Amino acid sequence: MQSEGSDQDWTDVLKIDGIRKSWDMNRKSLLKKKLLSMLSVILVLSGLVVISVPVILQSASASAQSGVASRSAREVAGWPYPRAKETLKAARAYNRRLAAAGQHALGEVKDPFTGAEGSISDKKYTSTLDAGDGVMGSIEIPKIDVDLPIYHGTSESVLELGAGHLYGSSLPVGGSDTHSVITGHRGLIKALMFTRLDELKKGDSFYVKVMGETLGYRIDRISVIEPSDVSKLRIVKGEDRVTLMTCTPYGVNTHRLLVSGLRAAIPDEVPYASAVRDTRPLPGSVVAAYVLAALCVPLLFQRPVEVPRHSSRVPAGRARRRNP
């Protein structure tokens, strides 16, 4: 009897030892899975950050630029009468002289994106239509969610701040025999500006806000030109035109995209700016990143299945036999 009891005790001990080894292996397997899950989540979150940072920077930049345009409009609204009217009158006189002279120069040198700053030397130009800090007014394109201040000239320092007015084109105050050219950067990581200009179609509208007035324009012409080609930027007798210009193709920038519109009455020919909405959804890459994050982040907080580290019990029905 003693021998049989001892044999049974050793059998139970070996079984318990096997169970403990199995538990240890399970714990190691669970730990490995947990580490892999955490690594996957970290990689997904890193990708989310890479995708989100430009979006955040662009949103912050757009908000700041829109704020500049709004502050400039409020400052003009606070001017004593008839300062704004006199400023518009001087700008229209400037445009008449420009049309009569035949536009001998267009741009800082030849191309507004060269970075030169020739307009700065023309004090008559820089002092005309100045709402303060070099701001003329603002360009609003509701369909692509653009609201930028318009500055004198198209130097690199200006285009970092907002849209620039092409030196040698009409000042953006409307009127017959005028053609104002507004330029903006495209494809910057930290700012959208005119990045989405290629989404506009014929019939879409944009708006120039200047000295308390809002001028509506309806797009009738979209074209691509060589940087040195200014034929489509010149004044045409009888027209009241504004052309928006940026670099193209996206990221290559060897040509210039022109989106041009003729003056249109608000609200008979174009709607109020407030009635136009940007209906573009979030970019697919951003949506995908957020979906992945929503699925993966909970893994960080998921508790693993608890496996007892030690146990002194033998499974039911396997109690060790004791000698009487």
What is each of the regions a protein language model found here?
Residues G5-G18:
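N-terminal intrinsically disordered, acidic low-complexity segments at the extreme N-terminus
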Residues G18-I19, W23-N26, L30-G284, P315, ...:
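Solvent-exposed, non-transmembrane regions of membrane-associated and secreted proteins
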Residues A273-P324:
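C-terminal single-pass membrane-anchor helix
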